[in-house]
Curated annotation (Swiss-Prot):
<dbReference type="Pfam" id="PF00101">
    <property type="entry name" value="RuBisCO_small"/>
</dbReference>
<keyword id="KW-0602">Photosynthesis</keyword>
<dbReference type="GO" id="GO:0016984">
    <property type="term" value="F:ribulose-bisphosphate carboxylase activity"/>
</dbReference>
<comment type="similarity">
    <text>Belongs to the RuBisCO small chain family.</text>
</comment>
<dbReference type="GO" id="GO:0009853">
    <property type="term" value="P:photorespiration"/>
</dbReference>
<keyword id="KW-0934">Plastid</keyword>
<dbReference type="GO" id="GO:0009507">
    <property type="term" value="C:chloroplast"/>
</dbReference>
<dbReference type="InterPro" id="IPR000894">
    <property type="entry name" value="RuBisCO_ssu_dom"/>
</dbReference>
<keyword id="KW-0601">Photorespiration</keyword>
<keyword id="KW-0809">Transit peptide</keyword>
<dbReference type="GO" id="GO:0019253">
    <property type="term" value="P:reductive pentose-phosphate cycle"/>
</dbReference>
<protein>
    <recommendedName>
        <fullName>Ribulose bisphosphate carboxylase small subunit, chloroplastic 1</fullName>
    </recommendedName>
</protein>
<dbReference type="InterPro" id="IPR036385">
    <property type="entry name" value="RuBisCO_ssu_sf"/>
</dbReference>
<comment type="subunit">
    <text>Heterohexadecamer of 8 large and 8 small subunits.</text>
</comment>
<keyword id="KW-0120">Carbon dioxide fixation</keyword>
<comment type="function">
    <text>RuBisCO catalyzes two reactions: the carboxylation of D-ribulose 1,5-bisphosphate, the primary event in carbon dioxide fixation, as well as the oxidative fragmentation of the pentose substrate. Both reactions occur simultaneously and in competition at the same active site. Although the small subunit is not catalytic it is essential for maximal activity.</text>
</comment>
<keyword id="KW-0150">Chloroplast</keyword>
C-alpha cells in the first residue's frame, strides 16, 4: 500500500559521456609580456641557505639561535594563552636513533623522559621557567624541551628545545 501512495522523488541522471571540451568556458587571457617583469632576483641575492652539515635540527624553533630567557618566556606565554598544558621532557641524547633494530620503536629516541607531571593549571611562564632551571640543575648534560599539550584534542601542539647542554656540538652554532 505504501509504494502506490508515495510519489517517486528520484530523477534520472544522464550517463557519463566523458570529459567535455573547455573551449566554451570563459578564460581570462594574459598577455605574454605581463610575466616578464616579475622577478625575485633581488631577493635571491640576500637569501641564505641553511648548512646541511654540522648543525642539527631539533624541534619547532631549531633554525633560530638559542632562545634567551625573555624569548623563552614569550614562547611559554603563547603556549599558556593558547590553553595548552606545558610539559617538560629531557634526554641525554637529543636525537632520534636506532641502536638495536632497524624498525622504529619505543627506545629509539623519539620519546623523552618526562620531568615530573604535566603542568595542569599553570598560569604563568615563570612557573615553567623555574622548572626548566630545576631540570638543568639536576641533569646539566641533558637536552630539555617544552611541549604544549592540548588536553581537549589530546594532541601535542608545539615542542621546542628550551636548553641545550654546554659543549654539545650544536649549542653555539644555531
Amino acid at each position: 500500500m505504501a509504494p502506490a501512495v508515495m510519489a517517486s522523488s528520484a530523477t534520472t541522471v544522464a550517463p557519463f559521456q566523458g570529459l567535455k571540451s573547455t573551449a566554451g568556458l570563459p578564460v581570462s587571457r594574459r598577455s605574454r609580456g605581463s610575466l616578464g617583469s616579475v622577478s625575485n632576483g633581488g631577493r635571491i641575492r640576500c637569501m641564505q641557505v641553511w648548512p646541511i652539515e654540522g648543525i642539527k635540527k631539533f624541534e619547532t624553533l631549531s633554525y633560530l639561535p638559542p632562545l634567551s630567557t625573555e624569548a623563552l618566556s614569550k614562547q611559554v606565554d603563547y603556549l599558556i594563552r593558547s590553553k595548552w598544558v606545558p610539559c617538560l621532557e629531557f634526554s641525554k641524547v637529543g636525537f632520534v636513533f636506532r641502536e638495536h633494530n632497524s624498525s622504529p620503536g619505543y627506545y629509539d629516541g623519539r620519546y623523552w623522559t618526562m620531568w615530573k607531571l604535566p603542568m595542569f593549571g599553570c598560569t604563568d611562564a615563570t612557573q615553567v621557567l623555574n622548572e626548566v632551571e630545576e631540570v638543568k640543575k639536576e641533569y646539566p648534560d641533558a637536552y630539555v624541551r617544552v611541549i604544549g599539550f592540548d588536553n581537549l584534542r589530546q594532541v601535542q601542539c608545539v615542542s621546542f628545545i628550551a636548553f641545550r647542554p654546554p659543549g654539545c656540538e650544536e649549542s653555539g652554532k644555531a
